[in-house]
């Protein structure tokens, strides 16, 4: 009881009027949308809320609800007296809101009832305070008529209202998220919320446009137009950004060009690499090894890697004699001479493996016996190209071997150090190439004097060096 008494004390006149309106809605069997219109156009001294008018605007996209909203508004214009000017004023305000935010069908229907709206431009009412309250109604009616007659202004106002609606909702001007989409589930009607009829609509493009599929579709078409306009603006913004991106792209291209120009100047590196490879000893560089032959005696025998082409003729007879005496009896003086003088004699060392007493033929054989093919006798001016046969049994044609003579068999393996020297001297006198070799030996005899001293002083290091030279010759 106390709660009922407290509520009764807090009830005022406006609460009683609201309860009376609810009762009238039930008695008069008004629909929910008609009840909202009656609430938005009541006689209270305050205006209708924006949320309530937005719900009514959503209902205009439905065909059945649209036929409930607009007739109720027009009844406010005609059925109300001058004393209820607030309801007339609120009805004009709601109709203007629907023209800007509602369906495009509202514009067509309002233009059809434009005569009723023009009558309100002459509305007069002076209250008990001698105040002209009809001024607000006349002003609002005049503005609404001007809006309905200006199609360009309607397009601008609808576009502005759509942008404001997007700001309040927080979605923007995207047509996918609209308040009108919620009207499908909130205010169901017969069939689909999309109109199945075809009629002329008032498009945002200006004036009466082509036939659309319905109220909802025409609104979505206008929304799509607006979205396309926004897309164009975004495209312009992207175009500006694209120009900046193009500038950055040009700068990057310029940097790439500079890098390519710098990279074109780099082919000098392979030459440096080739110089490094030469330092490793893969190319012909015999000159650094020659000064070492004069300074140190053990290194004198190590300069025959590629220098044997020039130093083969510079070998003295005494050095070949000493080198031949260091080996055992199985190795003859001729074999030692070949190992010391010739760089390519190892490839044809088979004929030299047999001992021979008369070594005069070896003086005419150099580089594996290739030079003994065209031996010219010094005594006669004319000669016949026949192979010259010595006492040893060798034929000079490409180093072909023959049977040994009696002197070679009697000589055996024991050779003295004086026999090769005599053979060298005798062979050089009878052969033109031998004389050349002997003259070369006489010229470099002084340079090889140090080599003879080392060979005579120590025999074992010389043999090791000789083996090392033989291995190098095999590698060649």
UniProtKB/Swiss-Prot annotation:
GO BP term, example: Golgi to endosome transport
GO cellular component: actin cortical patch; clathrin vesicle coat; cytosol; endosome; Golgi apparatus; plasma membrane; trans-Golgi network
Low complexity bias spans: 178-198, 213-222
Acidic residues bias (residue ranges): 229-240
InterPro entries associated with the record: ENTH (IPR013809), ENTH_VHS (IPR008942)
Modified residues (Phosphoserine): 173, 228, 243-244, 459
Chain segments carrying region Disordered: 157-198, 213-308, 410-429, 444-472
Record keywords: Phosphoprotein
Bias (Basic and acidic residues): 262-271, 444-454
Signal peptide limits: none
GO molecular function, one term: clathrin binding
Keyword RNA-binding: no
The keyword DNA damage appears for this protein: no
ENTH domain: residues covered: 30-154
PROSITE patterns recorded: ENTH
SUPFAM superfamilies: ENTH/VHS domain
Modified residues (Phosphotyrosine): 235
Pfam families found in the cross-reference section: ENTH
Transmembrane residue ranges: none
PANTHER family, per database record: CLATHRIN INTERACTOR 1, EPSIN/ENT-RELATED
Name of the protein: ENTH domain-containing protein C794.11c
Organism: Schizosaccharomyces pombe (strain 972 / ATCC 24843)
